[in-house]
C-alpha cells in the first residue's frame, strides 16, 4: 500500500536537553519527509541517542518542539505517537522467541481491537508484504538474524504507520542480514513511509539515506547527502576519519 506524500511530515525544532547542568543536546533542528530515509549520526557522546529518544518519546526535551504533520507531539507518550502514525523499532529484541512468526504479528494485531476477519486479512497482507509467508509457522527462536530483523520490522508496521523510527537496525546482524535490512528500508521508503534511523554503522547507513545529520557536542555539525558529508573536512576530522571511503 503506497502512501500519499504530503511534504514535510516530521519537524524537530530547537531541541534542548540538559543533565546535571550540562547541555547534551543544544538546539537541534531536523526535518524528514515522507518517502525519504534520513540518518542521524555522530561520535559517542555527541547527543544523537538523546535526540533520537526525544523524537521517539522516551525522553522529553527541556525546550523546543517536535511537530508531526503540523501537530505538536512533544508531550505525547509513545503509545499516543503510535496512534498518530509513528512506528518505532527498538534496538533491543522485541519479538517473543517461543511464539511463531504469525503469532508474533497476531499478538500486536490483537491490541488494535479489530474484528477477527480484519486481523486475519491484515496478518496475511503483512506476511506477504515483508516476504515472510514461508516462515509463518516457524518459531521465532529458530530464525536467522536477517529473518528476525524482518519480523521485528513487520511487527512495527502492524499499526500502518506513516513514519518509522529505527534504532540501530544494522546492529548485531551479519552482512547478508544488513543487506536484507537495507532492502526492506528501501521498500518502505518507496511505499511512502518517512524513515529516521540512527546507527553506528556509518557506511551501511549512508548507503541508503537520502539525507543525513552528523552531530557533535550536542549540535548538528553538518547535514546533507552522503557526498556532502564525506567531502566535508570537519565531518572527517571529528567523525568519519581521513581514510573513510564509500
Question: What residue ranges belong to the model's regions?
Answer:
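Helix-to-loop junction immediately C-terminal to a conserved catalytic motif
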Residues: 56
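Conserved ABC ATPase "signature" region
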Residues: 117-135, 183-186
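The feature captures the beta-strand-to-loop junction immediately N-terminal to the Walker
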Residues: 41-43
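Catalytic Walker B motif of ABC-type/P-loop ATPase nucleotide-binding domains
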Residues: 164-168
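Conserved catalytic motifs of ABC-family nucleotide-binding domains
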Residues: 160
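Conserved ABC ATPase signature
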Residues: 139-143, 147
Amino acid at each position: 500500500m503506497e502512501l500519499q506524500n504530503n511534504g514535510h511530515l516530521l519537524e524537530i525544532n530547537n531541541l534542548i536537553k540538559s543533565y546535571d547542568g550540562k547541555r547534551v543536546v543544544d538546539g537541534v533542528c531536523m526535518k524528514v519527509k515522507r518517502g525519504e530515509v534520513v540518518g542521524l549520526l555522530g561520535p559517542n557522546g555527541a547527543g544523537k541517542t538523546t535526540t533520537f529518544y526525544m523524537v521517539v518519546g522516551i525522553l522529553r526535551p527541556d525546550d523546543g518542539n517536535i511537530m508531526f504533520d503540523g501537530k505538536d507531539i512533544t508531550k505525547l507518550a509513545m503509545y499516543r505517537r503510535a496512534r498518530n502514525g509513528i512506528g518505532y523499532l527498538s534496538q533491543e529484541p522485541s519479538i517473543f522467541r517461543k511464539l511463531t512468526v504469525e503469532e508474533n504479528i497476531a499478538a500486536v494485531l490483537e491490541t488494535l481491537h479489530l474484528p477477527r476477519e480484519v486481523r486475519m486479512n491484515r496478518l496475511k497482507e503483512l506476511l506477504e508484504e515483508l516476504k515472510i509467508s514461508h516462515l509463518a509457522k516457524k518459531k521465532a527462536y529458530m530464525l536467522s538474524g536477517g529473518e528476525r530483523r524482518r519480523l521485528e520490522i513487520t511487527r512495527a508496521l502492524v499499526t500502518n504507520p506513516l513514519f518509522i523510527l529505527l534504532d540501530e537496525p544494522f546492529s548485531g546482524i551479519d552482512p547478508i542480514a544488513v543487506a536484507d535490512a537495507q532492502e526492506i528500508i528501501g521498500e518502505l521508503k518507496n511505499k511512502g513511509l518517512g524513515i529516521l534511523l540512527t546507527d553506528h554503522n556509518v557506511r551501511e547507513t549512508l548507503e541508503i539515506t537520502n539525507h543525513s545529520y552528523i552531530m557533535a557536542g550536542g549540535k548538528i555539525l553538518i547535514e546533507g547527502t552522503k557526498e556532502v558529508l564525506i567531502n566535508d573536512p570537519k565531518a572527517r576530522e571529528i567523525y568519519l576519519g581521513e581514510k573513510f571511503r564509500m
